[in-house]
Amino acid sequence: MKPIQVGLLGIGTVGGGTFSVLHRNQEEISRRAGRGILIKVVADKDLARARAMVGDRAETTDDAFALVRRPDIDIVVELIGGTRIAKDLILTAIENGKHVVTANKALLAHHGNEIFLAAQKKGVMVAFEAAVAGGVPIIKALREGLTANRIEWIAGIINGTSNFILSEMREKGSSFADVLARAQKLGYAETDPTFDIEGVDAAHKLTIMAAIAFGIPMQFDKVYTEGISRLTKEDIRYAEELGYRIKLLGITRRTAKGIELRVHPTLIPSKRLIANVEGVMNAILVKGDAVGPTLYYGAGAGAEPTASAVVADLVDVTRMHTADPEQRVPHLAFQPDRMSDLPILAMEDVETAYYLRLRVLDRPGVLADITRILADQSISIDAMVQKEPGEGEEQVDIIMLTHLTVEKSINDAITRIESLPVVSGKVTRIRLEELGRN
């Protein structure tokens, strides 16, 4: 049988890894796919780099649009990143009847609805396992492995850079700024780390997972996003003393009022497996009504872990290449005409527990004033610690953990607490999730 002909867009870190894995494991891959998979041509703006990497094993070009129009190409693999040019290339490939494999989370989060509709009309597939959590097969699990379940919630560590920073802050007692500089030196953080440390990258991935889990359109603009740049080593230490660890989580949950979509630092009980995921690793908890909680763990980035997911998609597309489109797994797991328009819950309506840290004057009556404000908002306290003042200091830290309460209530309480003359500066608020069976 004639090999499937692949056009590869981009031969950078992931593109190079994909080319390497596909050639190194060619025999195993073809046995699994049922036919050979051949990278016929590689397009890259740096033609010299492309030629140096592929040698005589594939054609090279710097004209990506010519590649996606070639009649001899069956599958286009998009690994150039960005949203503008990548979107145009993918839509052109689809228009020309090509199946597409992509690792482009930002593109799908922003334009996935348009891309999937175009693919549906042309009867081609868009595969995107590598777009979320690198080598962790979470898309496959959500689309197929958990298809018998009504997904209740997902909570994941889905950005390795942020997880590395938080792990180092906890283990070494370092400040955020110091660990960020170290992460950049080690190559774990970009020169401009904004997407990673402010939760944008995680929000892209959460958008995709929520769409598959609940059969809703991609809605990146409705994800509440808060990063880790304001976290202090003191908060990480206090959380540890209380039996918790702080992780940047992407959380989506089905509720009676709508779907939660949120990315933010979160206290998790130290006893949970996901709380012990360290360094640049990723982990995703998925709760299904039948299966209960399931955990997916692995490398969320890197050349070959991500290439593993890209090549897995190539094998899937190759297997289904000649299948009737009606027999294929839908892009977002649900049949296109059965997608739901469930409302996205506003952040102020989300119910969770909270960690609060206040810097206050060490005077009688201060605690009574604060607890009175919390009681006025029907917020009950689960645990509280008052730290001893340092030598010569007049201020102390008070740390509180609340029971479940609505975000709007905690916001109103914080506003009133910060107006008290005995309270110094802003109240630190970090959300808390138990992540048990419920």
What residue ranges belong to the model's regions?
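Rossmann-fold NAD(P)-binding glycine/threonine-rich loop
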Residues: 86-96, 105-143
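Substrate-binding/catalytic subdomain of NAD(P)-dependent oxidoreductase enzymes
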Residues: 179-276, 281-283, 302
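Low-complexity, glycine/alanine/valine/leucine- and proline-rich hydrophobic stretches
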Residues: 264-289, 303-304, 375-392
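N-terminal glycine-/serine-/threonine-rich beta1-alpha1-beta2 phosphate-ribose binding loop
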Residues: 1-96
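Rossmann-like NAD(P)H-binding beta-loop-alpha module
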Residues: 120-201, 208
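Glycine-rich phosphate/pyrophosphate-binding beta-alpha loops
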Residues: 294, 298-304
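A conserved regulatory-domain signal marking ACT and ACT-like small-molecule sensing domains
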Residues: 309, 314, 318-438
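A short hydrophobic/small-residue beta-strand
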Residues: 99-101, 381
